[in-house]
Amino acid sequence: MDKKASRIRRATRARRKIAELGATRLVIHRTPRHVYAQVIAPNGSEVIAAASTVEKVIRESIANTGNKDAAAAVGKAIAERAIEKGISNVAFDRSGFQYHGRVAALAEAAREAGLKF
């Protein structure tokens, strides 16, 4: 089993548990160049809020798009947008990525901005 298949297997297991709980989830995805975050409704078919380093507003406020500072900016933005829509409690879906580096930076920034998970 290769690295990507292992990550997807871990992500599927976590998503199944979150769906069982019926929680709104904060989903993250990272690539070497960008970080993406979405708040998804419990039914799994509606995106409530989204933020990423691809967006011009966020990209202009940071020097690089693929580092921890960029992830923190995305975390702050997604928290603000979710709270604006009335969502304050979420389940953190790390998509099988290790809770370290950019993933942890995004999560901590979202918590500091007011999201609870």
From Swiss-Prot:
Keywords: Ribonucleoprotein, Ribosomal protein, RNA-binding, rRNA-binding. It comes from the Bacteria. CDD domains: Ribosomal_L18_L5e (cd00432). One of its GO terms (cellular component) is cytosolic large ribosomal subunit. One of its GO terms (molecular function) is structural constituent of ribosome. NCBIfam families: L18_bact. Belongs to the universal ribosomal protein uL18 family. This is one of the proteins that bind and probably mediate the attachment of the 5S RNA into the large ribosomal subunit, where it forms part of the central protuberance. Part of the 50S ribosomal subunit; part of the 5S rRNA/L5/L18/L25 subcomplex. Contacts the 5S and 23S rRNAs. This is Large ribosomal subunit protein uL18. It comes from Photobacterium profundum (strain SS9).
